[in-house]
Every structure is written in structure tokens, then in C-alpha cells.
């Protein structure tokens, strides 16, 4: 029997959420940027020998949709919070905007996967902003208590499959109480470090 999993993808405008989903579901990279309002994709996968159907919800990151976006949150099994590895601003908004929005609109907060996008551009001098390192990403994961931190590229597909496999895995095999306790402990420990790295 196939397990249906609702995956909600959120993050700032232009961090590559739609490209991420199109690349994963169609194995192709979109040629031009098209701002998303709301869109849905579906993908079948097998995680630990269990067939799953991922219902992937693409959301608009712009402020004009702030009041409408959370209407799609009920029933979400796992959130993917995206930021661009070449945008410090989008990274900061993980803890300033996206994590608080999830907390405020969900009675029970489902697992969260934190994802750094545009891996192929990091270190290429393509951004005027400070780039985000793997260490900074892990600190942010701890600060918000996310289940996993991953980095990927929609263009090269490096790390792409891992993102969605982890999303399916955390729903199929929820963390134990011990793992959750450790995550919360890491969260408290990482909170100061993460805020320090954000304001550097």
C-alpha cells in the first residue's frame, strides 16, 4: 500500500523552490523564472522499501501572500524550509519569518527539513551577499529544531533526491523520544551560535 505524504515547501522568493520541485519531479530544469502563487506536484518514491507518494506543495514567498499561504498548511506531514546558499538574507529569514510562521499556524508542528539551495553557485562569486557555509546551516538546523539539514542544486541535481528521501523517511519513521530530546537539546545549544552566525 502506498503511503501518501503531504510536503509543504516554503522559503523566500527566488530561492529556487519551484526549480527544486520541477527538477525533482520532471528531471528537467526550467529555463526561466516564473513566480509561484500556489502549485502542486506529485512524485512516487521508495524509502526503506516502502512505496510513498509525495504530494509536493509549492508556495509563494512574497509578502503579499502572507495571509493566504498558511491556509494550505493544515494536514502537512513535513515542512521543507528553503533558503539560498548565496543569500544571507534568505538564510536569516528562516528563523525570522518561516519557522515562526509554521509555529504560529500549526497546532502540532510536523517535522522540518532545512534545505540550502543553489549549491552549484556557492563559491563562484555570483552573489554580493555573504554565502552560507555548511556549518552555518547545521547551526540553523539546531536553532529551529529541524530534523535534517541538506544542501542541493536543482540545476545539477546534486543532493536533490536526498532532500525528498529524508522528507519521506521522517514521516515513515518518526524520531524516537530520545532523538527528539537530543534535537531539542541541540536546538537550545545551537540557538546562540546560530544567532551569532546570522548577525556576523
Curated annotation (Swiss-Prot):
Keyword set, alphabetical order: Cell membrane, GTP-binding, Lipoprotein, Membrane, Methylation, Nucleotide-binding, Prenylation
Region span, Disordered: 178-200
S-geranylgeranyl cysteine lipid attachment residues: 197
Residue positions, PTM Cysteine methyl ester: 197
GO BP terms, alphabetized: actin filament organization; cortical cytoskeleton organization; defense response to bacterium; defense response to Gram-negative bacterium; endosomal lumen acidification; establishment or maintenance of cell polarity; exocytosis; mitotic cytokinesis
Keyword field contains Membrane: yes
Extent of motif Effector region: 33-41
Superkingdom as given in the UniProt entry: Eukaryota
Propeptide regions on this chain: 198-200
An example Gene Ontology molecular-function term: protein kinase binding
Membrane topology according to the record: Lipid-anchor
Subcellular location: Cell membrane
Keyword Cell membrane: yes
InterPro entries per UniProt: P-loop_NTPase (IPR027417), Small_GTP-bd (IPR005225), Small_GTPase (IPR001806), Small_GTPase_Rho (IPR003578)
One GO term describing the cellular component: cell projection
Family of the protein in this entry: Belongs to the small GTPase superfamily. Rho family.
PANTHER family: RHO FAMILY GTPASE
Name of the protein in question: Rho-related protein racH
Organism of origin: Dictyostelium discoideum
Gene: racH
